[in-house]
Amino acid sequence: MSVFVILILFNAILNFKTVGPAAVSSKTVDCASAPCMNGGTCADGFNNFTCFCEEGFTGSMCETEYGCFRPWFYGPAFGYCYLWERVDYNWTQARESCIDQGRGAELASIHSAEENAFVYAQIRRYAWIGLSDQVTEGVFDYADGTPVDYLSFPDKNKQSETRDCVYVKHLRVDNWSLLDCRANKTSICKSTTTFSATDGCATGWVHNPATGYCYFYEERGGMWSKGREFCLDAGADLASIHSAEENAFIFDMLTEFVWLGLNDLETEGVYTNFSDGTPADFDNFPADNYQNEDHDCVSIRHLEKTDRYWFFLGCDDTVTSICKRPHEVVATQAPPYLFTTTDVPATTTTIPTTTTTISATTRTIDAMILIELLLFPNNVSSIDNIFRVNNTILVTASVLGSFQALSSQILWSITNHLSGDSVQYTVYSEDAVLVRFTTVSIFTIKATAVGNSHNLTATANATVKHVCISSLTTSVKEHCDAPHPAVYLRAFDIHISTHMELNGKCIDPMTPDFKWRIFTSTEADDVVTAFEKITHTRQVMIPRGTLPYGIYSLNLNAKTRLKTSGEVTGEKEIISWLEIQPPPLVAVIKGGASRSHGVSSNLIVDGSNSYDPDVPPGSSSNVTFLWYCVVVDPDVMYSSLDEAIQNTDNACFEDEGIMMNSTSSMIEVIANKLNANVTMNFWLNISKEGQISGLTQQRIHLTLGLLPEIEISCISNCNMYIFTAERLVLHASCTNCDSENEDVSFRWSLESNHTSVIGDLSSQTTTGLDQPYLVLKPLTFDSISEMGSIILRVTGSQSDSDGYAEFSVDLPHNAPPALGSCVVTPDEGYALQTDFTVTCSNFTDVDEPLTYQIILFSHVDVVDWMFVGRGEGFQLYEGSAPIKDGLYLPVGVGTDDHDILLQVNVRDCNMASTSVYISATVHPPTLDAVGMNLVQELLDMALLVETNVNALLAVGDPGQAAQLISALGSILNSIGDEDDSEEGRETRSEIRSFLVDCVAAIPVESMTSLKQSSAALAVVTHNKQEISTHVQMLAASTLSEMTSFVKSKSGSYTQAQENIESAGTILVEGLSNILSAAKETERLLSDDTSQEREDHKNLIEVAVSTINDIQDAIVAGKIPSEAATIITSPALSIAVGSISRDELAEATFGGPEDLGSFRMPSQDVLNQAMEHALGTTVSMKMSAMKWNPFSWPGAGGESIKSSIVGIQLEADQMLEFHDLTADIDVYLPMRETLSADPVSVHITKTSSDSVLIDHSSLPVDGALHLTVIAENEPMVALSICTARISITESSCVGTDTPLGVSNEDPDTDANFTWTVPLVDLKAADGIMIRLYDSEDQPGYENDNITLSVFMHTLQCNFWNEDQQEWDSTGCKVGPLSKPSTTHCLCNHLTGFFGSSILVPPNHAQPVIGGHKLTGVDFLICVLIGYGIYCVALVIRVVGCSFAIRVHKVL
C-alpha cells in the first residue's frame, strides 16, 4: 500500500499562474542513465533524481521487492499480508472467499499474542479465522495446516457439538469464541505471497506508458458538453492528443465516433487549446476536411480506411467520449526509510507549523509564497487541512510580491511523519501538484521558489486520517421472485434500505448522511433528477406516485461526519436499478359482491367508484366502461365472465344481449323491467390504453316488495387479495333509509356458498357484529386460508323486511412457512457481558425470500405452562439471515428469575408468518458489589456503550443502538433496586442522563426505530429517584418529537394503525415514568425556588401536549363503534375511541376502574347542544393521571393532591356542553384511599371512640367514607353509628351498623369500610366506633385493639376557565359513589388542557394538632373536596360502658 501518490500537473493544465517574473530553468537531467529498477519512473531534480517505485518495490532505485496489494494490509512484524473481508459469510464460504483471492490466501492462522493484537486492531466486527474442530470434536486445527501454538479463548469459553468454528471479537480481551459454523460473519484472510506491481490507473481506465496518462472510454454517449461533464466528474477531461502515437493509441480503443477535447465554439475556425488547457500542437484532419458553421466540436471515428482522421460534428450530436487524466505514479510503502531520494534525508521528527521563509538574513520581506490545499476535483478546502486516505489533493503555490525567480518551477518537498520518522520526497513542477496519500499520517508539504539572490519557502501540514466507510450496499423491498431491475407499481410506496460498514479504526463520534437520488433520462439524453432526499437512517421511502413509468438509476451517496466539527470522515456512492410500471385498473361496483333488491323500486348498478390507482383521488381516471349481464342460478358462483357466458345464454333483459348497450359508469333499470326471484349477474370491464384492464362482478337477487338497500364498502385492505396480516375494515349502509326516522339494525356473519355459517367472528372483531362498521383483527383468516374465497354478509333489518349485501374475501393460497426451530445460545448469561445468538433452521416456504423478525419481551408471564410476553415487545432484528449474533439482551426482571422471552416471526414475501418462542435468562453483569469499583465499572460500561452507540448511529443503525441503551438501562434498574447509597444513585443518575442524550440523538424516520427508541427511553427513565429535572425535560421533549412523528403517520385504517397504537403504548409508559419522576422532584422542591417550579411547569406543559398528540394519533385511525384503545400505566392511563354522531346519545365510554368512564345523556338533550357541530363522527378521549400535575402557584390547584381525569369530545371541532337539561354521568377512580397517614386508635371491650364533625365545612350532599384497618386483631367485628355526643353522655342517633370480617383475604389492606350519608351525619354530632357485641362475636385475644382510621368525603370539581379556578358549580356527587369510585353528575363539559378535567378527592391528609380535649384527643384536618374540613376525632378510655364525653371543635 502506497503512502502517497504524486500526479505531476503543469501550470497550463490547471490554469494557475505564478505571480512575479519567470526565469529560465537550468536543471541538470540525471535520468538519462535510467537508474530506476523494476519499472520505477525517474524524475529529474536540481542535480539529483527521484525514483517513483511501482507497488511492491522500495529502495532509492526501487531495488527491493516487498508489500501487499490494496486493500490487503501488511504485517511487517510477521511478514504476511492480511485482508479483512467485510462481507458476511458462513465459515465454509469465508474460507472459499479467501482461497479465491489467489496468491496462496487462506483463512487466517494466528500464532502469537502480537499477531492476535495486530489482527484485532484491523477489524470492526466479529470475524472468522481459520481455526475449527470440525474434524474431531475438541481437537483444533488451522485451515492452512500451520500448527496450533497459540490460543486466546476466555476462561469461561463455552463449547458444544454445534459450535465448532472460531471467530475473533473486536473490543474484547481474550477475544476468541466458538460459534455454529453456519453463522454469517466477516472474516480475516492471510497470504504469504508478495504481489506484483500495478499500472497506477483505476479500474476500467487504460494506461498508456508512452504518455503516462490513463484513458477511459465512456460508452453511454451524449452531447459534447455532457461528455466533458462526465470526464470532469471523474477527475479528468476530454482527451487531448499531442502526437501520432497517442492518436493511434486512442484510435485502437474505439468502436465508433468519440468526442475529443477540442472545439472552435468561441471563434469559428480557431482552436488553439484543448479543453484541458494544453496547446493544440497536433491534429489529424483529412486534407479535404470541410467544416459546416454548425459543426464546432471535434471527434475521432474508428474506421479502417480513415487513417485515424478527426472530424467536426454538431456539438449537440450524441457521441461517446474519451476521458484522459494523469497516470498515478505510486511511491512505495515499506518501513520508515520509505521515500528515499539521492538527497540526504531529513532527520527531524518535529512537525513544523505552516510558515513562509526566505533564505537571506538581511533582506526586507517584500515577497512571499502561499500554499493552498484543496480537495480535487471540486477544489474545495478542507477543515484544518484534514484529509482522508486516498483523497486527491490539489496543492498550489502562489508567489506574491517582487521576486526574481531563477525558474518558473517550484521545488516541492513532502515530509512524512509516520511513526515519528521524517523522510522527504522531492519533485519539481510548476505551481501545482496533485497528491494522493494512501496511508494515515501527518505530512508537511514544502514549496520552494528558487531565486537569483534568495529562495522563498513555505510549508503546510496535511493530516491524513482513515476513510471511515468500508462498504455500502442497498436492498429494495421487492416482491416475490422480482426481476432485475426490480419492478414496482407506481401506486405503491417503495421502501429502500442500505447497509454500511465502518472502518474499525474510526472511533470518534460520527453521524451519517445518506443522500438518495433517483435519475432517469429524457429522449434528448438529458439526465433528470426524479427523487432526492437526505436521511440520517438507513431507510428511505419513495411515496407512491412519485416516479413516472420507466427504468431508473438509484444512486446512494453515504457520508460520515464528525459530530464535533462536521468534518467528512468517509464517503461512498453506489448505483442500482429499478423499474416503475403501471398497475392494473380496479373495477368496483358499489354495494359489494352481491346484494338484494326489491322489485318495487328502480335498480341502480353503479361502477363510478372504479379507478386507476395511479390517478389521485378526486381526479378523472378516463377509463372506458363495458357492461355485461346474465341471469344465473343463485347457488352457482362463476369465477370469470367467460365461464358465466359459457354456462348460460340468458341475457338479463329481453331487448338486449349479454353485452349491454350502456358504456356509462352507472346503469339504472326501471322497476317494471324487474322480475322477482331472479338473480342477475352484472359484470363490469374497465379499460384504458397502456394498462391492464379491470374486471369485477356483482350478483343481485331480486325479491318482491321494497327492501332496505344494503351496501358494503371496503375501507381498508381492499386489494384483489387481502393481506391476512392486516386488519380488514368494512362499512355497511342503507341507501334508501331515512336515518333520522327509521332505525336499521345490522348483523354480520361469515359464510361460504351463501348459506352455511362457517365461523364465529365475535372474538375476532373490535366492533362487534351488530354495528355498521366491521373491523376484523389481523390474522383472522389464517386458519381458513386454504379455502381461497369466503363471504362476509351483512343483513340490514328494518320493520318487517330484511336486505343484505355480501363482500367476497379472496384469500391467497399462501400457507405460512413450514415450522422450523430457533435456539438462543447461550441460554443463560449476563447483560452486556454475554454475546447472545439466535439461530433458526428448517423454515421453508415456496414464497421466498423469508424474513426473520426477533421481538424481545423483558416481562414474562406463565400461562398454561408456557412463557408469554407481557406488554409491547422490542424489535431486536429484522432481515433475511436465519442466524443473528451480537444481540444485546437486557437484564430480565428479578421477580421473573431474570427470564426474558424472544418471539421469532418468520414470514414469506406474501406476509404469511409462523412464530416460535424461546427464552433465555439474562442476569445483571458481574460487578464489584460495593464502593468505587462498582462506580468505575458502571462508568467504564457507559463509555463502552457510548463508543458503540456512536459507531452504530454513524452507520445508520438506530435499532442496535437502542438495544445497547436499553441493556445498560436495565442494568441500572437492577442495581438501583439493591443499592440505595447516595454515591451510587448519583452515578446512575449521571449515566441515565447520558443515555437519554443518546436516545435523543437517534433520528426517528420509521415506526420501527421510533418504537425501539421510545422503549429504550422507558427503560432508562424507570427509576423516578434517579431522573433529574433536566433529564425529565429532555426525555419529555424527546417523547414529544417522537409523538409528532407518530401523528404524521396517523389517519390510516391499515396495518399502520396497529403500529401507531403499539407506539402509543410505549410512549405512554415513558410519559408515566417522567410524570412519576416529576412528582418525586416536586415533593423535594423548596418553596422559594421559583426557577425549579418554572421548570416543573414547562415539563408538565410538554407532557400534557404529548398526551394530546398520542390520543390524536390513535383516534385518527379509529373506526366508529370500534372497541376503545386503552393504555394503562402506573401514573398515566388513556382511552381513545370513535363513535357515530347519531350513536353518541346514552353512549358509555371509558376503561377499567382505575381509568374511569362517562355516559352521555339522551338524544333530545344533546341535539340542541350539538346543532352547530358538522362532523358525522365523534372522537372520544379520556386521560387519567395519578396525581394532579397542575400544582404550581397560579394553576389554582396547589392544594389539590388527588388524581385527575380529562374528558374530550370532538367532531369537526371541540364539543363543549353548557347547562344541559340532563346530567352527564362521570365515574372517577379513587386511586389512593389509603395513602394518607392514618390515625392510630386503641379500643377495648369496654371502651369506644368517637369522631366529632365540623358540619360547617361539609359538602351539601354526598357521603363520608371511613376505612379502618385492624392492625393487630384482623378477626374483629366493629359497628358504627351516627351519634349525638355531649359532655356527659353519648347515644346513637342512626342505626347501629355492624361490619364483620370473613376468613377470606380482603381485596385491599382495609378490613372495614363504611359509607355514611352526609344527610344522616348532619342529624348528629359525630360517629361512634366500637366492638360489636353479638352471640357469634369472635373471641378477642387482646384487650387493646389497634385501629388505623382513614376518612374522606367526596366532591366533584372541574376547572373553571372563566374564573381560572377549580369549581364545583353544576357538578354534584351522584348516588352510585363508593369508596373506590366517585360518581359525578355534571350538566356541562368544557375545555381545559384540551379536555374537561374532573377531580375526585380521594384521600384524607390528617394533620394532628395540639388541641387538647378531655382525655386523649386529636384534631384532624381532612382534605375533603379540596377544601379543608376539620374533623375532631376524640379518643378516650373511660371506666363505664361506652361512656363518651364530647367537645365540639369550632
From Swiss-Prot:
* Main localisation: membrane
Q: Name one GO biological process term.
A: detection of mechanical stimulus
Specify the GAIN-B domain's residue ranges: 1274-1405
Q: Where is the signal peptide?
A: 1-26
PTM comment: Autoproteolytically processed at the GPS region of the GAIN-B domain; this cleavage modulates receptor activity.
Spell out the PROSITE patterns in the cross-references.
ASX_HYDROXYL, C_TYPE_LECTIN_2, EGF_1, EGF_2, EGF_3, GAIN_B, REJ
Show the coiled coil region(s). Answer: none
| Biological role | Receptor for the egg jelly ligands inducing the acrosome reaction. Could be a regulator of sperm ion channels.
Residue ranges annotated for the REJ domain, each copy included: 468-1187
The record's subcellular location field reads: Cell membrane
* Sequence ranges on the Cytoplasmic membrane side: 1436-1450
Give every C-type lectin domain span.
77-190, 210-324
Question: Which part of the chain is the EGF-like domain?
Answer: 27-63
Keywords in alphabetical order: Cell membrane, Disulfide bond, EGF-like domain, Glycoprotein, Lectin, Membrane, Receptor, Repeat, Signal, Transmembrane, Transmembrane helix
Enumerate the transmembrane spans. 1415-1435
Kindly list the residues the record flags as site (Cleavage).
1389-1390
Extracellular domain ranges by topology: 27-1414
Q: Which GO terms describe its molecular function?
A: calcium channel activity; calcium ion binding; carbohydrate binding
Name this polypeptide is given: Sperm receptor for egg jelly
Q: How does it sit in the membrane?
A: Single-pass type I membrane protein
Q: Name one Pfam family in it.
A: REJ
List the GO cellular component terms. membrane; plasma membrane
